[in-house]
Amino acid sequence: MPSLPLSQGKPLDVPRTVHQALELHRQGRIADAERLYASVLAVRPDNIDALQMLGDIKLARGELATALRLFAAALQLRPKSPQILSGYGLALNGMGQHGEALAAFDQAIKQKKSFAEAHNNRGGVLVALNRHADALESFERAVAIKPDYAEAQYNRGFALHRLGRNGEALKAMERAIALRPGYAKAHANHGVVLDALGRTADAITSYDRALAIQGDLPDALLNRAAALHALKRYDEALQSLDRLLAGHPNHADGHYMRGRVMVELNRPDDAVACCEQAVALNPEFTRARWTTPLFTLPILYAVQSEIAVRRADYERRLRALRSDIEAGRIPGDMTKGLGWAQPFFLAYQGQCDRDLQTLFGELAVKVMAARYGETELAAPPQPGEPIRVGIVSGFFFQHSVWKIGCKAWVTQLDRERFQVCGYSIGFRRDAETEVARQHCHRFIEGPRSLAEWRDIIAADKPHVLLYPEIGMFHQVAEIAALRLAPVQCSYIGHPQTSGYPTIDCFLSGELIEPADGDAHYSEKLIRLPNIGFHYEPPEIAPATVTREELGLRASATVYWCPQSLFKYLPQHDAVFPRIAREAGDCQFVFIKHSGAAAVTELFQSRLEKAFAAAGLKASDHCVFLAGMELSRFTAASRVCDVMLDSIEWSGGNTTLESLAQDLPVVTVETALMRGRVSGGMLRMMGLPETVAGSVDDYVALAVRMARDAEFRAAIKSRVARDKNRLYRDHASIAALEDFIERAVRGR
C-alpha cells in the first residue's frame, strides 16, 4: 500500500493527523504512522500522543536513545502516566541503565497498581540484575492481575528456570504456549527447560516447533545445535549451525558452538578458527578466548610427531592469552568461561604437564582473585570440635570419580572427628546421589552460579576442601581456583596436577607413584597407603554374551582393550601387531569412541597401517564394539582371556572391573602416576608377575598369556583368590583422616 501524502502548503490539522496516525498504527502500518507522528512533532513538539507513540515505535525498532528522548519529553508533560513511565523504563533497561529502569517501573506501578505490563517489565529488569527471586515475584503479580498474559507466564517460567525450579518452569512455559500457541520464544525456552530436566531429545522437538513458527529464531537454532551436540548427533548440529550462520553470519555464539562441534569431530584447526571468529565478532566473549588454546588439542593423534606440534601451539596460545590479560587488552569478565578451558586432553600426550598446568593455573587463580578477592577462612577448630570437610564434585552419581575415592570419603570418614558437607555441582542424579545425601551432614545441589557456590561454601567455613577431580567438570575447576578453605586438596579422579596455587596437596597412593613423583605436581604430593583409595566393588546385574554375538572367534586368544581410544598413543600402535605375530590366533577387542565416528575411524586407520607394516591385516585381529551399559560391558569382558592395559595411561575403574571378573591384566609401568595405577593394583594383590618393566616385556607377557595356557590359568586363579585385597582398604581412609588432622590442627 502506498504511503499517505502530507498536505502541501496547508497548516497541519494536528488532531486529525494524530487520529489518522493512531489508526494506521493499529492497522500495523508502522512506517506510515511513524511519518505522521513525526510531522505532528515538527509543528507541535509537545504533542503527548505523538511523543509517546513514536517512542513506542522507536523502542520496538531498537532505536533506544531516540525512544528514551521521546519518552523523557512526554514525561515532562505527563510525569505520572504509567504507560509513558513503562516505555521510559523499557528504553532505560535496553540501554543497560537498570537502576533507573527499575525506578521508572516502580513509579508506574505506584500510579497504577493493577498495571500488569509494568509488573512484567519490572521483572525483566530484575532478571537483567540477576535478581531472579525478586523477578519471579514481579512476574507472579503480573499473572495474578492478568492470568491470560502469555508473556508474563513465559517470563515467570524463565525466572523459575534460572532459580533451578525446572518442574515449575516447565508448567509455566506450557501455560504460555496454551495461551499463545504461536509464541515462538515460549516454545524455544520450553526446550531449554526440558534440556535442563535431562529431556534433551524432547527439547529438540520444542526447538523444532519454535522454528516452524519463526524459522530464523537465533536462540532456537543455537540451542537446538547444543542439544544435538549433547546427544552426539554432530552432523545434525552442524546443519543447525549452518542455518543459523547463513541468516546471522555475525552470531558469535554460533561460531563458538560450531567450534565445539569441530572439537568432537577431531578437527582442532577448524575449532580454533571458529573460536577466533567468535572473538573477532565479540571481543568480550571471554569463554571463546579461554577455549582457543584448549581447542588446539585433538581428541586423538594421527602420528606421534603431531603431539609436539599441538603441545607447542597450546603453550604459545596460552602464553599469548596471559600476556593479553596481564596487559589489560581484553575487555569483559575473564572469570566467565574459565572452567570451559580446562585442558583435559593435554594429559593424554604421555608427558609431564606440571609446567604447562602451572602456567594455566596461576593465570586462572589470578583472574579469579581479581574478581572475587579474598574470603574469610575458617579458624582452626577448637579441641573436641569436628573438622568440617567439604567435598566439591560434579560426580555425585554412578561414575568412576564417585566410585574411586569420593564415595568412601562420604561414607567412611569418622563422623565423630569429621563433619562432611557435599557440594554437588553437577546436574545428574541417581541412587548414588541419595547415598551421598544420606551420609553428608549437609548436601547442597546445583545448578547454581559460581558466585552462589562461592558464597555457600564460604559461609559453611570448611576447614578442608577435597576435590575428587580438577579438570573434568567446568564449574569445579572455577571453584577450585578460589581459596575457600585453609587446606585444599585434589585427587586422582583426574590424574593430573591442577597447577593451581590454591590447591595445597595432591592425594595419591604409594603403590602408584614413582619415586620421583613429587616433581610431577605443583601441589605437595601426599602418598596414601597402597593404591590410595577405598573401593567398594559394585553389584552388577548379570548378563550373558557369547563370543559369536561379539564377532569373536571361539579359537582365538582374546585380549580385552576397554580403554577410551584417546588413551592409545600412536607411538604404541605397533604393540598390537607385534603381539599378534607371536601369539598366533588372537583378537583385540576395542570399544568405539562414544562421540563422533571420526575418532574411531582415525584409530582404525592407524591400526591398519601398523598391522600392514607387520605384514598382517588389522581386520583379522581387531574388533570394535559399540559402547554398552555396564552389565553387558562386564559380560563382554568375561568372554575375553586377558585385559591388555593401555600404555602411559593405565586403567583405573576399568581395571578394577576386569579384575572383578577374574581377568588377568597385563600392564607396563611408565614414568607418570597415570601410567602406573593398574600396576599398583596388581602389586597390592601380590601379582607383580604381570607388571612389565618395558614395552618389550609387555609384549612378551601378552604373548605368553596366549601361548602358555597353564600360566594364564594360574594367573586367573590368583586373581580370583586375591582380588579382595583391593576392596574396602580402610588403611587409605585412616591415613587420610590422620593427614587432615595434622593439616588442620597442626599436629
Where are each of the predicted segments found?
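Alpha-helical solenoid repeat scaffolds of the TPR/TPR-like class and their adjacent stem/linker regions
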Residues: M1-R553, S605, K609-K617, F624, ...
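Short hydrophobic beta-strand element within catalytic cores of glycosyltransferases
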Residues: P664-M673
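Short glycine/serine-rich donor-binding loops of glycosyltransferases
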Residues: T654-T655, S678
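Short alpha-helix at the nucleotide-sugar/activated-sugar donor binding site of glycosyltransferases
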Residues: L659-A660, R683
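Donor-sugar nucleotide-binding helix/loop cap in glycosyltransferases
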Residues: L644, S658
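Glycosyltransferase donor-sugar binding loop
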Residues: Y423-R428, F588-S605
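Short hydrophobic signal-anchor/transmembrane segments that target glycosyltransferases
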Residues: A408-E416, P570-D585
